[in-house]
């Protein structure tokens, strides 16, 4: 069903005037072009209803309100319907998602969405994407005013938007056309060869989206939610499996923690190494080491008889500066024993003066003995 613009827009609504393209043409061009192109007979709205065209309540409301008094949309041809610009509120998107899960899940949710399907994009966004593209470039999106698909394509003078209806047997048609197809892909390929009436324009190439999934439609999440809603037993079994998995995981964690604690408790601890015992001299100060007490037991034995002074050098340290001695031999080659002049020496050093005095006496006596006759 086609609506032609009699006035720019409804009073107070400035959304339609800011479109990138003018998507409507004069009413008198419609029938002429269609007759020249021999597009064939097109079923009217009454015929479409008899064939079971599925239109949502929002679509029916749009068609009825278009002919209401005082509206900007004037019913020019009851055989075609272009999309009425809408706000695309959240409630409409929710209804559209529910409709997709109910009727389109077999090809849209369970498979990869075609690249020409852009999801929830606005009319302005579609026109912005199609403006730099060549003639006949097209895309499919969700409608902003009805729960259905919209075919948007680039024409020579503007960007056109046509509603796509679905018959009772599941086939898709351009609303107002008589060519029905089981798949949207087949419908689009058909109009790459057969022109769309009444403008006589054909589709050339699809406009691929730049995202992995259609805008506003997560295929995996929606398919999962749809399958759960349709099969409550499956959903319950999944919940039970998740609960069992969580319980088993918790039990395994508790068992592992208990095993770890038991192994740590049964494992013998290594002995603590004892500190090395150092002699007490290590902890004494250097000052105390210099003044150590002499040993109680001497390291030498006292002689039974006194040792002569000249024998003090034997066995005594040679580095003592005050230990000066001289060995003197007697006439018979042996040292005199028990000389009356010598004093007893108890292993104590004598002074230099005593040594000189003794040496002088010995030398004078020896000279006297040599000089006297024997």
UniProtKB/Swiss-Prot annotation:
Keyword Cell inner membrane set for record: no
Coiled coil: none
The keyword Membrane belongs to this UniProt entry's keyword annotation: yes
Processing after translation: Phosphorylated on tyrosine residues upon TCR-stimulation.
Tissue expression per record: Expression limited to tissues of the immune system and, in particular, activated T-cells and natural killer cells. Expressed in the thymus, lymph node, and to a lesser extent, in the spleen and bone marrow. According to PubMed:10553045, also expressed in the lung.
Biased segments, Pro residues type: 268-279
Modification sites for Phosphoserine: 237, 316
SH3-binding (motif): residue ranges: 267-273
SMART domains: SH2 (SM00252)
SUPFAM superfamilies, per the entry: SH2 domain
Quaternary structure annotation from Swiss-Prot or TrEMBL: Interacts with KDR. Interacts with p56-LCK, TXK and ITK.
Protein name per the record: SH2 domain-containing protein 2A
Source organism: Mus musculus
Lineage: Eukaryota, Metazoa, Chordata, Craniata, Vertebrata
């Amino acid at each position: 069903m086609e609506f032609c613009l009699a006035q720019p827009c409804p009073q107070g609504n400035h959304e339609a005037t800011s479109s990138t393209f003018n998507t409507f043409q004069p009413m008198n061009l419609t029938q002429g072009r269609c007759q020249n192109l021999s597009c064939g007979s097109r079923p009217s709205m009454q015929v479409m209803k008899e064939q079971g065209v599925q239109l949502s309540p929002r679509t029916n409301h749009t068609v009825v309100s278009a002919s209401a008094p005082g509206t900007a949309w004037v019913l020019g041809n009851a055989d075609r319907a272009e999309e009425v610009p809408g706000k695309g509120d959240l409630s409409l998107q929710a209804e559209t998602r529910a409709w997709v899960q109910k009727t389109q899940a077999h090809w849209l949710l369970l498979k990869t969405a075609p690249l020409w399907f852009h999801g929830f994009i606005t009319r302005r966004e579609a026109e912005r994407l199609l403006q730099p593209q060549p003639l006949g470039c097209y895309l499919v999106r969700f409608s902003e005013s009805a729960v259905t698909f919209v075919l948007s394509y680039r024409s020579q003078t503007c960007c056109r938007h046509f509603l796509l209806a679905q018959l009772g047997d599941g086939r898709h048609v351009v609303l107002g056309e008589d060519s029905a197809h089981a798949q949207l892909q087949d419908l689009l390929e058909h109009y790459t060869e057969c022109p769309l009436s009444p403008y006589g324009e054909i589709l050339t190439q699809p406009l691929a989206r730049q995202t992995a999934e259609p805008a506003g439609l997560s295929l995996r999440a929606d398919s999962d939610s749809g399958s759960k809603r349709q099969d409550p037993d499956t959903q319950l079994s999944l919940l039970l499996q998740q609960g069992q998995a969580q319980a088993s995981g918790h039990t395994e964690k508790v068992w592992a923690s208990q095993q770890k604690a038991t192994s740590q408790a049964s494992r013998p601890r290594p002995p603590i190494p004892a500190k090395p015992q150092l002699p007490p001299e290590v902890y004494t100060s250097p000052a105390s080491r210099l003044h150590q007490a002499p040993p109680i037991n001497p390291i030498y034995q006292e002689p039974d008889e006194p040792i002569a002074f000249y024998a003090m050098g034997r066995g005594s340290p040679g580095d003592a500066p005050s230990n000066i001695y001289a060995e003197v031999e007697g006439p018979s080659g042996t040292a005199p024993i028990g000389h009356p002049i010598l004093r007893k020496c108890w292993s104590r050093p004598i002074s230099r003066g005593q040594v000189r005095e003794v040496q002088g006496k010995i030398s004078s006596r020896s000279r006297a003995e040599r000089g006297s006759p024997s």
